[in-house]
Amino acid sequence: MATSAIQQSAFAGQTALKQSNELVCKIGAVGGGRVSMRRTVKSAPTSIWYGPDRPKYLGPFSDQIPSYLTGEFPGDYGWDTAGLSADPETFAKNRELEVIHCRWAMLGALGCVFPEILSKNGVKFGEAVWFKAGSQIFSEGGLDYLGNPNLIHAQSILAIWACQVVLMGFVEGYRVGGGPLGEGLDPIYPGGAFDPLGLADDPDAFAELKVKEIKNGRLAMFSMFGFFVQAIVTGKGPIENLFDHLADPVANNAWAYATNFVPGK
């Protein structure tokens, strides 16, 4: 009888949790208008990447993990030598900044390599190397998107600068200022219209995707740093540097360039 009671209690708890997780959106009338809101339901992920038994930054050789790093959030490997996450408010702010920079870095890394890949496969560009492409706007013909003047044709660096400042500055200022458009939404994972494929509908799958995003984003940030260094040292794009390394790994590697690099030459 006791076993039956425990099973019934567990089943009831699972049913309540499922109903709670399924209630993601709530439509209500506010001032005669309709406002779509997403309610974030926090449940303990079953993934190996969360909780006290999650993988640590040095595996079994990791030192004492700070008590405030409990494995609640994605990407927590228990490493915080500088104590940057000790304050909860600072931790929340840094988490948001990291995810935003991860997403920018992933887009940036794709933008650095994709034009070179297309160029090497026959697509004509004015300049496919990422750090040289912008200078095409100063050429006589201006800058054509994908080398096609019928798509986006830019000739004024001032117009490009104004668009960047006005459009991106406005959006970023709105985000930082906490505009009413995002009220009731998670600032990092808003869902709703920002998740048209419904990737976050399954809580366990969503927890896994958060980990994948942060891991790939951190890798992308390191990649972008590497692309910057490559541009300064070799004057070539990442794909061309890769081909050079594959052709002659001994002469074209980080150690060889570091020992022979002379600034300004």
From Swiss-Prot:
A GO CC annotation given for this chain: chloroplast thylakoid membrane
Binding site residues for chlorophyll a 2: H101
Function per UniProt: The light-harvesting complex (LHC) functions as a light receptor, it captures and delivers excitation energy to photosystems with which it is closely associated.
UniProt modification remark: Photoregulated by reversible phosphorylation of its threonine residues.
Annotated organism of origin: Gossypium hirsutum
Subunit structure: The LHC complex consists of chlorophyll a-b binding proteins.
Gene3D superfamilies: Chlorophyll a/b binding protein domain (1.10.3460.10)
Transmembrane feature ranges: 99-119, 151-171, 219-239
Protein name in UniProt: Chlorophyll a-b binding protein 151, chloroplastic
Location of this chain's protein in the cell: Plastid, Chloroplast thylakoid membrane
Positions that bind chlorophyll a 3: Q136, L146, E213
Binding site for chlorophyll a 1: W79, S85, E98, R218
Cofactor comment: Binds at least 14 chlorophylls (8 Chl-a and 6 Chl-b) and carotenoids such as lutein and neoxanthin.
Domain of life: Eukaryota
Induction profile: Markedly increased by light.
Membrane topology: Multi-pass membrane protein
Tissue-specific expression: Present at high levels in leaves and cotyledons.
Written domain comment of the UniProt record: The N-terminus of the protein extends into the stroma where it is involved with adhesion of granal membranes and post-translational modifications; both are believed to mediate the distribution of excitation energy between photosystems I and II.
Binding site for chlorophyll a 6: H245, A254
Residues that coordinate or bind chlorophyll b 2: R103, I152, L181
Chain positions with N2-acetylarginine modification: R38
Keyword Magnesium: yes
Feature: transit peptide: 1-37
Binding site for chlorophyll a 5: K212, Q230
GO MF: chlorophyll binding; metal ion binding
Disulfide bridge map: none
